[in-house]
């Protein structure tokens, strides 16, 4: 395993451990980004189910022109995810950035989710 993969795996493990300690039963907003798309979901770890999800692959995103891996698509995904989560009764979450730094697309998604009604 390369040094970069080891570093990312350790960072991801460290972030998830700190989230478990501070979650207090709140669902987790998990983010995954690839080179072409961005995905986000709100997960209830106690029940083991996904409460809301959104990605840049969805038809509504493609019709709006927000496809791909740019900051505008991340903002649209964050807004859509927050709307779906609030509709399902979720208002407070913990933000799980995984091994990604809080910068760029990850930060844009988080800010859009906050503006649309989620608090973390």
Curated annotation (Swiss-Prot):
Under NCBIfam families, the record lists: L18_bact
Protein name, UniProt field:
Large ribosomal subunit protein uL18
Give one GO molecular function term: 5S rRNA binding
InterPro entries documented for this protein = Ribosomal_uL18_bac-type, Ribosomal_uL18_bac/euk
Listed under GO cellular component are: cytosolic large ribosomal subunit
* Signal peptide (residue range): none
Species name: Nitrobacter hamburgensis (strain DSM 10229 / NCIMB 13809 / X14)
Report the function annotation for this chain. Answer: This is one of the proteins that bind and probably mediate the attachment of the 5S RNA into the large ribosomal subunit, where it forms part of the central protuberance.
Q: Which PANTHER family match?
A: 39S RIBOSOMAL PROTEIN L18, MITOCHONDRIAL (PTHR12899), LARGE RIBOSOMAL SUBUNIT PROTEIN UL18M (PTHR12899:SF3)
Protein family: Belongs to the universal ribosomal protein uL18 family.
Q: Identify the SUPFAM superfamilies for this entry.
A: Translational machinery components
Its quaternary organisation is: Part of the 50S ribosomal subunit; part of the 5S rRNA/L5/L18/L25 subcomplex. Contacts the 5S and 23S rRNAs.
GO BP terms: translation
Q: What keywords are assigned to this protein?
A: Ribonucleoprotein, Ribosomal protein, RNA-binding, rRNA-binding
